[in-house]
Amino acid sequence: MKYQVEVIINEDRDKVSRLYVDMNQMPLWEKGLVEIIHEEGTLFKTNSKGLMVFSFDGQKMPMKVSVEKENLPDQIIQIFEVPGAWNRCDSHFIDFNHQTKWVMDVEFKFDEPHDIPLERFIEKTKTSMHIFKDFVEGKLN
């Protein structure tokens, strides 16, 4: 399953891309994130690998993260894996009239067939992008 989503962020591209990989601030906008573990290289650099550990309702859920390519402030390609699912996110940060256009090409692969409509995935991705947008623009409490 593949799709593309985009959002305009009212900040310059350098700030947006810097905050996107700032591990100290990531828990402020990445819902449920409680720990980031480096396994290979410096996480969020090309060929790095690690874990992002989330906590939902007291249950910890580790998610593997690897970086296929990091060419910030322009682009970062990340692969996220949880049991049964593989997700590739190719994020482009484009300078756009003193703002940033964030375009994300998303791909999912699943071990088993599922009946979740594509629209749900698009909606979830847009929601998480808008949370990051609000964080960058200083609108999160």
Segments and roles (model prediction):
Residues 1-45:
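Hydrophobic ligand-binding cavity/cleft-lining segments
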Residues 2-6, 49-51, 62, 75, ...:
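Intrinsic-disorder/low-complexity, polar/charged segments enriched in Ser/Thr/Lys/Arg/Asp/Glu/Gln
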Residues 6-10, 37, 53, 66, ...:
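Generic structural detector for well-ordered beta-strands
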Residues 11, 56-58, 69, 95, ...:
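Beta-strand elements of well-folded, non-transmembrane domains
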Residues 38-84, 127, 131-140:
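Glycine-rich portal/gate segments that line the openings of hydrophobic small-molecule binding cavities
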Residues 79-134:
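Beta-strand/loop substructures that line and gate deep hydrophobic ligand-binding cavities in soluble
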